[in-house]
A protein has these predicted regions:
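Solvent-exposed, non-transmembrane regions of integral membrane proteins
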Residues: 1-421
Length: 421
């Protein structure tokens, strides 16, 4: 055990020296075919180590439990640190001086995991060379772990993660990486329609500084389809009328005869809102938003008016109460949003589908995620932002994980049979 501990301590020390002298490891050095060559060299080296195990003590030591336990303990400890320390995105520098916030590029972490991977590979070769059906579960488990570790690390260099900004009606085939470099892709996406489902509007009371009341735990009224009246901050609130898609009557009158191309260019400012008359009317035009007619009472005081969160076409409107307070509608929160798209591929596919948040679509090795949209335009957004991810080594990682699970189940079953005997 002392030798294994000494090796791990040496790897940690060497890793720290490399970290401070060379900086974090750049996995881009292992882009294909470098990662494939590295994997082949590693396997050949492990085979040579096994053949020379009787001549070189170190090679035979690699297959012992005295080598495995310190390596597993160090890897587990570093993984725990990785889970506790907040990790920064791959394109950002480490947030701390040592580099614990970018653990996947942290030399001590990499060297310890590399050492553990070598031990797993060497034990797999040893078990395979002494093959028996009784050992099949443990061979399968070790082989799966070796495949998962090597392919997940070496394959990370080939993973592509790109953002694509698609405007309605225009096919787009270019994506941006984390450094804003443009990449032309073998697939194109055309946005046909963006849809969004929103949570019911929320009303709250704010002070003259714009802070919700009460300060520590603001009160909120959820105005769903069944809400008629309620109380907030000492005021009794009654909903007289609710229009889910509304625009100021004055704005609707101004643009009704305009061409559609010009309607989106007209915006009602705060001055126009102050001068407006006629309240709000139901409208299907782009830029409409929820508007609620409110009667607020407190003792003998009564306030009536409209409340809306506004949109890119017109600003929000509040209901003035007393002592500088106002009743406001918070910005609507999205419950679900998705894009109806056409996906074109170089091999002639034309796929019509819907891409929803957390429900990616997979085509030709690419996973397409709904990432964002034009939040200023909200549900009327004419732009969808997609994230496209391609990981050519992912299937190999899955194979390793499945083998690991199969081996674990096999060991559990064989252990049960031994107990019965």
């Amino acid at each position: 055990m002392k030798e294994g501990t000494a090796i791990v301590a040496g790897l940690l020390l060497v890793g720290l020296l490399l970290q401070f002298s060379m900086g974090p490891l750049d996995w881009a050095l292992f882009l294909w075919p470098a990662n494939g060559i590295t994997l082949i060299v590693l396997i050949i080296a492990l085979l040579i180590f096994y053949l020379l195990r009787r001549r070189v003590y170190f090679f035979s030591f690699m297959t012992t439990i005295q080598a495995a336990i310190p390596a597993i303990a160090a890897a587990a400890l570093l993984t725990l640190v990785m889970g506790v320390a907040r990790q920064v995105p791959a394109d950002k520098p480490a947030a701390d001086l040592i580099g614990l916030s970018k653990m996947l590029n942290f030399w001590p972490f990499i060297l310890v995991y590399f050492w553990m991977t070598m031990l797993v590979g060497e034990i797999t070769i040893k078990q395979t060379a002494r093959f028996s059906w009784r050992r099949l579960p443990i061979i399968t488990s070790h082989l799966g772990l070796f495949i998962a570790l090597t392919c997940a690390t070496l394959g990370s260099a080939d993973m592509q993660r790109l953002k694509m900004y698609c405007e309605k009606g225009q096919p787009e085939w270019r994506g941006l990486d984390a450094y804003n470099n443009v990449h032309e892709l073998p697939i194109a996406i055309q946005l046909n329609r963006f849809t969004i489902d929103e949570y019911p509007p929320k009303l709250m009371v704010i002070d003259k500084m714009g802070r919700p009341i009460p300060y520590k735990k603001p009160e909120v009224l959820l105005i769903d389809d069944y809400f008629k009246q309620g109380s907030i901050a000492g005021w009794h609130i009654q909903v007289d009328k609710k229009i889910e898609d509304a625009v100021p009557a004055l704005l609707a009158g101004m643009i009704k005869n305009m061409p559609k191309q010009m309607q989106g260019m007209l915006h009602m400012d705060s001055l126009g809102m102050a001068m407006k008359k006629g309240g709000y009317i139901k409208s299907s035009m782009a830029g409409s938003a929820c508007a609620i007619s409110i009667t607020a009472t407190k003792g003998n005081a009564m306030k009536k008016g409209w409340v809306t969160c506004g949109s890119y076409q017109f600003p929000l409107e509040t209901l003035k109460l007393d002592n500088g307070k106002a009743l406001v509608m918070a910005s609507r929160e999205p419950k679900r949003y998705a894009s109806d798209v056409n996906i074109y591929t170089q091999d002639g596919k034309n796929i019509m589908t819907e891409i929803e948040v957390n429900k990616p679509y997979t085509v030709n090795g690419w996973k397409i995620y709904q990432l964002s949209y034009n939040e200023q335009m909200g549900k009327w957004s004419n732009v969808s932002v997609f994230e496209l991810v391609r990981d050519p080594w992912l299937h190999a990682v899955y194979v390793g994980i499945y083998l690991l699970i199969i081996g674990a189940v096999g060991m559990f079953l064989t252990a049960g049979k031994k107990k019965e005997k």
